[in-house]
Amino acid sequence: MNKRKVGSKNPNISSSPAKRVYSSPQAAMQLSAKVFLGLLKQNQGNLDLENCHYHVTEEVCIENEFSKFSIHLGCGVFEKSLSVEGVSLLRTLSLGSSTIKETLSLKTSHISTLNFGSAKIHGQASLDDITSNGIDFDQAHFNKEGSMKMVYSTGPLNLGEAVFESGLSLEDVGAESINAGSANLGKLTLKELYFGTFYTDSATASKLTIQGNKLSFRGNLLDTSRILTQLDSENLQDSLATRLARAIEAIKDLPSR
């Protein structure tokens, strides 16, 4: 009788990183950028799957080959930087509960739905030349500076419960509505903002600077009829409502020349 040896391996069975990525967090497979992008394409952009844990060891750039994809990053770890650049139409970008240990850069792309989930970004985070139908910072945590420049949403820009440890700057940013939520904005810098309504909600800022004066000012931030505040937040020193009201008043009180 021929006996089969228990535990023997078939040398013809593939053991590629992409196939072994589905495991426990403790055994998360380390992937190169090339293997990660291949895995992303193989799963049609969706890595938010049960028991899908991955660790990318190289810098990753998502480019126009992923146009028309909906990308859900799940709970991956990016040891280096993550960027999205030059994508003509990304239907969805959801960062899930991913961790990015260096920088996050979203540049020159249309992202229909952008959600930061509960992602943790250890390096600087920037959005530059981005159009969208809706942006939600959700519960994301930013250890270093966050910046938005030439960012336009035809829908809401929600700051949610996000935390910006080192501050946030917005320059040439437009949205149907800006909803500050209960975000901790740190040192907040505003320049050239366009919006239908600005809801300050219960958000806080350790400092707020509005760049520009009455002669050079662009945007509608000085139109206080568009800014809605909560009555119980107006008297709190660090509340966004208080900081914003004082900064706007200071600009209006400046001489015209």
Where do the model's predicted regions map?
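N-terminal leader/targeting and pre-domain segments
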Residues: N2, G7-R257
